[in-house]
Amino acid sequence: MEGSARAPGRVAVTTAGLRGAQWDRSALPPDVRISIETLRTHDGAAVTGFLMARGGERNVVCAMHPREMNPAHYLAPAVLAAGSAFWVQGSRTPNVDLRLEHETALLDMAAGQAFLRALGFRTTVLMGTSGGGPLAAFYCQQSARRPQERIEHTPAGRPVKLASADLPAPDGVILVSSHLGQGPLLQSCLDPSVADEKDPFKIVDALHPFLPANGFRPPPESSVYSADFVGRYR
């Protein structure tokens, strides 16, 4: 939602998340080689990654999402064409939201970073798309801390071995269509215009985001909401 005035003819434009673009194998350089690697994390879990390289690269871009395993990442061809290798990996619990713990996913990412450093890559850059963005930021925060200052337990109380783990620090971060984290994302999905949880059709018009009077415009126009409406809605 925006609080600024709507410009004439303004059209909504979004960037592509993991599900907003298509994989095009024909766009890969013809000399690319793809290897599949299974790694062990510091706490003994197994994770899988895909390394795409043409040979001789000193830099590698690393894509990881906490929930999705996406070896067919739509940005791989562009990264390879620019002269860097491309690494994409999953967590220990791909595609299973109920078992995902971001704290242990940091150990999964660390296994990938250690593997790439051992291969001799001089520079590693994390690329976080959608939910991969806050995961990359979380990893950078924990890797920059002294071991004794790292998180010791998940929110549910499960011990996590970040203090004794090697968390190789990346040299950079790229955020693509990133959100602020799973908690803020889910919280923003709550609809305050629903007056009664037992009756989802009972709506408070003053908070209804799809009423033209509140700023809604049908596509392809962009909806624009006043700062007052956004404040009350949030």
Predicted regions and their residues:
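Active-site glycine-rich loops that stabilize anionic/oxyanionic intermediates
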Residues: 55-58, 63-70
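Gly/Ala-rich beta-loop-alpha elbow adjacent to hydrolase catalytic centers
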Residues: 127-137
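Conserved alpha/beta-hydrolase
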Residues: 76-100
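N-terminal cap/lid segment of alpha/beta-hydrolase-fold proteins
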Residues: 3-59
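Hydrophobic beta-strand anchors of alpha/beta hydrolase catalytic cores
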Residues: 61-63, 86, 173
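Catalytic nucleophile-loop/oxyanion-hole region of alpha/beta-hydrolase
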Residues: 92-125
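Alpha/beta-hydrolase-fold enzymes
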Residues: 159-234
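Conserved hydrolase catalytic core segment
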Residues: 138-171
